[in-house]
A protein has these predicted regions:
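Short glycine/serine/threonine-rich phosphate/pyrophosphate-binding segments
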Residues: 46, 68-73, 94, 124
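N-terminal glycine-rich "phosphate-gripper" loop used for MgATP/nucleotide binding
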Residues: 63-67
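ATP/nucleoside-binding phosphotransfer catalytic cores, i.e., glycine-rich phosphate-binding loops
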Residues: 188, 216-224, 231-304
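Catalytic core of DAGKc-family lipid kinases
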Residues: 9, 19, 40, 78-83, ...
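Gly/Ser/Thr-rich active-site loops/lids in small-molecule metabolic enzymes
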Residues: 154-165, 206-235
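ATP/NTP phosphate-donor binding region
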Residues: 1-61, 71, 302
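Short aromatic-hydrophobic micro-motifs that form the base-stacking/packing surface
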Residues: 62, 85
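Glycine-rich phosphate/pyrophosphate-binding beta-alpha loops
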Residues: 139, 143, 200-217, 284
Length: 304
């Protein structure tokens, strides 16, 4: 691929965004490429900008934001010949980390320029949840409920939520789910259906980050392979402190006798008789009675 026209999509309310850094990035990119810059105004705007970029013949869309905006760009560009690249400006930057991109956005820009000038790009496989692509993770149950709780507290952007609030919300949900009957049923590939309280499907390890520490929910996951699935069959009240420590304190893999783990799956089906929350790449996908998760192989051009 040859990269000449670039669109830089900027989320000005992303957690680590700064105007000074943006100015440096713009200057660096415009020295080698025909650059256009657009700021997002609201949720969903990044997707609209990327769709228009495809129609306009832009070669590469660069997103300077966090994982939520990355997800919008991913969904707009998958299946097209327009490539994407990501520069870190979010709270966790899971996608950027998984690609081995530096967390310093200026350093990451230098890497991007070098690869784009050498026409280096690769095809990335994506997870698909009911027709919605995801780059890093998808969840049904506890983690989706946590994301919904944050969306309710911070409807404009999660950039302003603090780590204490996140941990408090997660703890509240763990305690609330403890002792509950498993009301989900999960079937992984051709396996038998299993009862579940919460299902987490990861494409990366770590699954997410907290205070810079990786939360290793899907420790064998890789962007080069399929779907890794962790399912919690039961959450005993006496197990809540141990699991909370595994999640927030130890950076070790979440494990236990009531936890099922499958590596490199191709299909996950989650069903329930009552609606359950779903999240993709940290944003709520609403309530579902049935969720089918699969893998779309090599559908997105990526420079990174």
């Amino acid at each position: 691929m040859r990269f000449q026209r670039l669109l830089l999509v900027v989320n000005p309310v992303a957690r680590t965004f700064s105007k000074g850094t943006l100015a440096v990035i713009e200057k660096a990119l415009s020295a080698d490429f025909r650059l256009e810059v657009a700021e997002t105004k609201e949720r969903g705007h990044a997707s609209e900008l990327a769709v228009q970029a495809v129609d306009d013949g832009v070669d590469l869309v660069v997103v300077f934001s966090g994982d939520g905006t990355v997800n919008e760009i991913v969904n707009a560009l998958a299946g097209t010949e327009t490539a994407m690249a990501a520069l870190p400006a979010g709270a966790t930057n899971i996608f950027v980390r998984a690609l081995g991109i530096p967390l310093d956005p200026v350093e990451a820009t230098g890497m991007l320029i070098a690869k784009a000038l050498d026409d280096e790009a690769f095809k990335l496989s994506l997870g698909v949840a009911d027709g919605h692509y995801f780059a890093v993770n998808c969840g049904a149950g506890v983690d989706a409920a946590a994301m919904r709780r944050l969306d309710e507290k911070f409807p404009t952007t999660k950039a302003r939520f603090d780590r204490v609030a996140f941990r408090a919300a997660a703890w509240e949900l763990l305690v609330g789910y403890a002792g509950r009957r498993a009301d989900l049923e999960v079937r992984i590939d051709d396996g038998e259906p299993l009862p579940s309280l919460s299902v987490m499907v990861g494409r990366t390890d770590p699954y997410t980050y907290y205070k810079g520490r990786g939360l290793r929910v899907t420790p064998d996951a890789s962007l080069d392979e399929g779907l890794d699935v962790l399912s919690v069959r039961k959450l005993r009240r006496r197990s809540v402190p141990r699991i909370a420590w595994q999640v927030f304190g130890s950076a070790r893999h979440v494990h236990g006798r009531d936890i099922d783990y499958v590596h490199d799956a191709s299909r996950v089906l989650v069903t329930s008789s009552t609606p359950f929350p779903v999240q993709v790449d940290g944003d709520s996908l609403g309530d579902h009675l049935r969720l089918e998760v699969g893998l779309a192989r090599e559908v997105l051009w990526v420079v990174g």
